[in-house]
Amino acid sequence: MAKRGKKYVEAAKLVDRAAAYSATEAVELVKKTNTAKFDATVEAAFRLGVDPKKADQQIRGAVVLPHGTGKVQRVLVFAKGEKAKEAEAAGADFVGDTDYIGKIQQGWFDFDVVVATPDMMGEVGKLGRVLGPKGLMPNPKTGTVTFDVTKAVNEIKAGKVEYRVDKAGNIHVPIGKVSFEDAKLVENFKTIADTLQKVKPAAAKGTYMKNVTVASTMGPGVRVDVSTLA
């Protein structure tokens, strides 16, 4: 661990903590300061001027990144009849109804995203205590409770990411891997920033995007000039 710590310290020296870099410069620095030996995830963090305790300042949704995240998402769809067939045809990894509910209750979690048709939510709701804390519960706001299972599965497989403000007003979103071309990471970064601007709550006062940073899984954070994300 000491060796990794030393690498991180050396990498951090390349970042001027007082500076706010352009999106392009920040992405270049993130790659330069990546200390992981694997293809690390690049994550953007937004500190927003909202009060998540207030219902009218909750921010939650999903967006399809133009270049995906570099991660293959395993999709579980709760559906029956024709909708189950549609989900299978769209490329869902697992499709079923009540059979998977029992499996999950017994500790099975070999999936990354859960989609459910509205008529299945009465049953899927039983998994609230299990899926909720893991952020896996289907939700209409993120497009994962829908009869259009084909669209839902296609978007997830194409690189759809969910975002949700935490109690401190922060949102963390993966924007790709360090192996991505700089331009693709920047475009993904700008896509999520633009989306968050569009969903700004009317009740939010003062500066909305207070601070934005980007970092690789094991690298230091790089502060970004918000104006360069427009």
From Swiss-Prot:
GO terms for molecular function: rRNA binding; structural constituent of ribosome; tRNA binding. InterPro entries: Ribosom_uL1_bac-type, Ribosomal_uL1, Ribosomal_uL1-like, Ribosomal_uL1/biogenesis, Ribosomal_uL1_3-a/b-sand, Ribosomal_uL1_CS. It comes from the Bacteria. Keywords: Repressor, Ribonucleoprotein, Ribosomal protein, RNA-binding, rRNA-binding, Translation regulation, tRNA-binding. One of its GO terms (cellular component) is large ribosomal subunit. The keyword Oxidoreductase does not apply. Gene3D superfamilies: 3.30.190.20, 3.40.50.790. One of its GO terms (biological process) is regulation of translation. Signal peptide: none annotated. Part of the 50S ribosomal subunit. Binds directly to 23S rRNA. The L1 stalk is quite mobile in the ribosome, and is involved in E site tRNA release. HAMAP family: Ribosomal_uL1_B. PANTHER family: 54S RIBOSOMAL PROTEIN L1, MITOCHONDRIAL, LARGE RIBOSOMAL SUBUNIT PROTEIN UL1M. Belongs to the universal ribosomal protein uL1 family. This is Large ribosomal subunit protein uL1. It comes from Bacillus cereus (strain B4264). The gene is rplA.
